[in-house]
Amino acid sequence: MNFIHDYRSPRVIFGPDSLARLPQELERLGIDRALVLTTPEQAPLGRQVAEPVIGHVAAFYDGATMHVPALVAEEACKIARTSEANGVIAIGGGSTIGLAKIVALRTELPIVAVPTTYAGSEMTSIFGITEGGVKKTGRDARVMPRAVIYEPRLTLELPLSISVTSAINAIAHAVEGLYAPDATPLLTIMAQEGIAATVRAISRMYQSPRDLQARGDALYGAWLCASVVGNVSMALHHKLCHTLGGTLDLPHAQTHTVVLPHALAYNARAVPDAMRVLRIALGHDDPPTALYELARDNGAPVALRDLGMREEDIEHVGDLALQDRYPNPRELDRDALLALLRDAYHGRPPSA
C-alpha cells in the first residue's frame, strides 16, 4: 500500500441550531463588513440568515446564478470592493458558493459558507467560471471557505425535485473519489459512509420531505462526499458534466444525476476495488444500475433530452470532452464516449 494523505478542509459547524454560531465565526475571522451573496430566489432567506449579524453586513448581492457567468462574477467583485467588504457570507447552493469562490480568488476575502443544498462546493478548493460558452475550472486554496455552517433546517424548504438531484450530485463526488489516482484509505472510508448515508436520506426525504433527521443525514452525507472530491483529482464524470453545463447551460445537479450511472458504467471494469466499495455502500450488485434506479424511483431525471439537450449536440459535447486529456481509469475512446452520451441523452439504462 502506497499513498500520500494531505487532507484540506474548512472548519465545520454541523447540526440543528448551528446557525447560532454565525456571529462567533465572523468574529473569529475578523469579519465586520460582510458581503452577503445569494441567488435571486434565496434573497429573502439570505436576509433572514444575516439578520442576527446585520450590523456587520456591508452589502447584499443576490445575482448568483448557475455556472458563475463571468459578468456576474465581475459585478459581485465590484460590489465587494466598493462596499469595502472584508469577508463574504455565501448562503445557498453551488451557484452562490461558486460565486463566492471567484470573489475570494480575486479579492482574497475569507468566506463563511451556509449551504442550503447538498452540492458540496463549500468543502473544496475547486472553482469554476463560464465565459463565451466555456466553463473553466481550477483549484486554489484561497477559494476554500474558512468556515462552513451546516444547518439542516435551512434545507427543509428545498423543493423535493432539487433535493434528490442535489443529493445524487453529492454521491457523484464520492464515486469519482473512489477511483482517483490520489485516493487514500481514509478518503475511501469517507466515500463509502457518505454514499450510504446519502442514499438512505434520499428515500426518506422522498417519502417525507420535511423529515429533519433525513435532511440532516443528507447534509452529513454531502459533507463527507464533498470532502472526498475536494482532496482528489476528478475524472470522466465531472469532465462531462462541466462540459454539458458550460456549453449547453444544462442545470448542474440534474446533469450530474443523469450522467453518473453512465460514467460509472464506462469505467466499471477498470476499477474493481471501487466497485466492491460501491456494492456495499449502495446495497446492490450492479452499482451503475443502482444509481440509475435511485434517480428514476425518486422522481429525478434520467435523460439529458429532458434537461434541454438536443441530439445534434452529442458529437460536439463528446469532442469537447476529449480536447483536454485528464486522468481516467479507462482510456477515453470517442466512439465509446458518444455511445455513453447517446444512452444518457435517451435515458436508457447504463451499459458498459
Swiss-Prot record:
EC number: 1.3.1.32
Record Pfam families: ADH_Fe_C (PF25137), Fe-ADH (PF00465)
Keyword Transport: no
Pathway: Aromatic compound metabolism; 3-chlorocatechol degradation
CDD domains named among the record's database cross-references: MAR
Presence of the UniProt keyword Oxidoreductase in the record: yes
Record GO terms (molecular function): alcohol dehydrogenase (NAD+) activity; maleylacetate reductase activity; metal ion binding
Reactions listed under catalytic activity: 3-oxoadipate + NAD(+) = maleylacetate + NADH + H(+); 3-oxoadipate + NADP(+) = maleylacetate + NADPH + H(+)
Native species: Pseudomonas aeruginosa
Top EC group: oxidoreductase
Name of the protein: Maleylacetate reductase
Family: Belongs to the iron-containing alcohol dehydrogenase family.
Classification via InterPro entries: ADH_Fe/GldA (IPR001670), ADH_Fe_C (IPR056798), Alcohol_dehydrogenase_Fe (IPR039697), MAR (IPR034786)
Gene Ontology BP terms: catabolic process
Alphabetical keyword list: Aromatic hydrocarbons catabolism, NAD, Oxidoreductase
